Amino acid sequence: MSLTRLLIRDFRNIETADLALSPGFNFLVGANGSGKTSVLEAIYTLGHGRAFRSLQIGRVIRHEQEAFVLHGRLQGEERETAIGLTKDKQGDSKVRIDGTDGHKVAELAHLMPMQLITPEGFTLLNGGPKYRRAFLDWGCFHNEPGFFTAWSNLKRLLKQRNAALRQVTRYEQLRPWDKELIPLAEQISTWRAQYSAGIAADMADTCKQFLPEFSLTFSFQRGWEKETEYAEVLERNFERDRQLTYTAHGPHKADLRIRADGAPVEDTLSRGQLKLLMCALRLAQGEFLTRESGRRCLYLIDDFASELDDERRGLLASRLKATQSQVFVSAISAEHVIDMSDENSKMFTVEKGKITD
């Protein structure tokens, strides 16, 4: 699936843009503040319902406008799909697919699997566990049809349980929540464990190519003790949870531990090496999706040249081309991406929110 057409209206500093896109590489070149990252963010928002640089909707809608509008055409092997997203200042969204309203953002996410690589993406490696849980959950969402519903129900039940912890005095009063929570937690943890085991070889192979000087290991931590039933953990920790007023153990505390030569990667790797590792993990995840489902990711890469020398840029470019996926790359100068260009790619120039090809 590739995005063949993109219409942007009143998004960030872009008043209007109508772009015919390449199924291969699409380059967005312009000075800082020109709007090139806004194009990447528009694509991301069309597939996620939210921007990646700000959660405040007022900052995403163009100044003095009431809403942004995004439309796209997705070309699959057999059919074309029209998609659209409108969001106003109150945060109300309207999702349209093939001319009909009432759809969910999760449907857009399923139609447009994408990988985002930005200068801020180091949080996958040096940020808190929530960023690595999101990495695992992206894979589970696209590989397990029941994951999104289970994950949504888990969040709801944890919120209710945490509220109940402020009121109850005996564990028996929590059993109605835990009766629902326990099987969901175990199912989600099983899916995450299966996904991390399934993608382990892809991550190891890609990392070996990108960072051959390090021995990298990946270990999934489910969020409570090994060999212990979650029901036992919840009951045993009731008094502590009640004092904390939140549930201290469970899939909401899971992590994917990443180590280089036995030490945490954030303590061992340089910024350039961390970026290579981040790119390797995103590529491995996209390639695993293709192998498992036949579907390809869109790759969004902001500020391609940052932190990478010529050799590393060339390595990343060659691996991206090998995926045969659609790729969107922003850069300050065309010189940074010209060696990636071929007869199928498109080069866009961005200046003060105006986009030309």
From Swiss-Prot:
GO terms for biological process: DNA replication; DNA synthesis involved in DNA repair; double-strand break repair; SOS response. GO terms for molecular function: ATP binding; single-stranded DNA binding. It is found in: Cytoplasm. Gene3D superfamilies: P-loop containing nucleotide triphosphate hydrolases, RecF/RecN/SMC, N-terminal domain. Pfam families: SMC_N (PF02463). This is DNA replication and repair protein RecF. Belongs to the RecF family. ATP binds at residues 30-37. GO terms for cellular component: cytoplasm. The RecF protein is involved in DNA metabolism; it is required for DNA replication and normal SOS inducibility. RecF binds preferentially to single-stranded, linear DNA. It also seems to bind ATP. HAMAP family: RecF. The keyword Lyase does not apply. InterPro entries: DNA-binding_RecF, DNA-binding_RecF_CS, P-loop_NTPase, RecF/RecN/SMC_N, RecF_2. It comes from the Bacteria. Keywords: ATP-binding, Cytoplasm, DNA damage, DNA repair, DNA replication, DNA-binding, Nucleotide-binding, SOS response. The keyword Repeat does not apply.
